[in-house]
Amino acid sequence: LPKELLEQDCVISLSKMKTHALERITGAVKNSYGFVYGFHKAKGHTQYPSADSFARMLIDLNKCVAPKLYVMDGIVAMEGNGPGSGDPVPMNVLLMSTDPVALDSVFSRLVYLKPEMVPTNYHGEKMGLGTWKEEEITLLTPDGEISMAEAVKKYGNPAFNVDRTEVRKNIWTRMAGALNIFQKKPYIEADKCVRCGICVQSCPVPGKAVDFRKGKGKPPVYDYRKCIRCFCCQEMCPKKAIKVK
């Protein structure tokens, strides 16, 4: 972390309401990864490649930096292929809290995503950073206190494009994980790719999981045996040519 950050009297975290290929959403908790600078960001993805391990690292990071206030801009949010290549969608909300887990859980509910399905919410509550439980959250608006149901009815968007897939922790999913099958994978839409190489540069894996294996006259190619599913390539692509399936 930059020493200047740790020398400040107060830190305020300003996040954008967006989807995320690895963590489902990126909001208050995930925003703190922006405090990590330079190539340390890429190193973090190789050290914590899974959604759960990455989420736990983010919880520790938030405890270390300890922002006094978390503000989330949801006036225009991003849905779909986030966090860098999604589509803008108006949510018309500005949220703030001293509890980043509660803030992200409200975001989750507004887009009809179960908050406990978001790794940063689940581990954030387990590790004592905050709470996603509705009965422990108070919602205040300029017009006074409202219930979660009232907030969802007034500000929610059930059509918001976010991954709501249920993950079943049984023997078949564990076997699939071990065999590297049935996992989300990034892929390149050749007609959109301009072969700029930013995806190759952003890949944190030693030896590169995506590279110009057929020469720079054609789009980069993935080696899924190396890919750790950090989706840095998808996040950094300036042409929205990388999707996750």
PLM feature segments, named:
Residues 1-189:
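Extended, low-polarity segments enriched in aliphatic/aromatic residues
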Residues 122-130, 216-221, 226:
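Small/polar glycine-rich anion-binding or flexible loop at a beta-alpha turn
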Residues 198-216, 221, 232-245:
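Iron-sulfur cluster-binding cysteine motifs and their immediate structural context
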Residues 191-192, 225-226, 236:
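Short pre-active-site segment immediately N-terminal to redox-active cysteine/selenocysteine motifs
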Residues 174-215:
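C-terminal accessory/binding modules appended to enzymatic or scaffolding proteins
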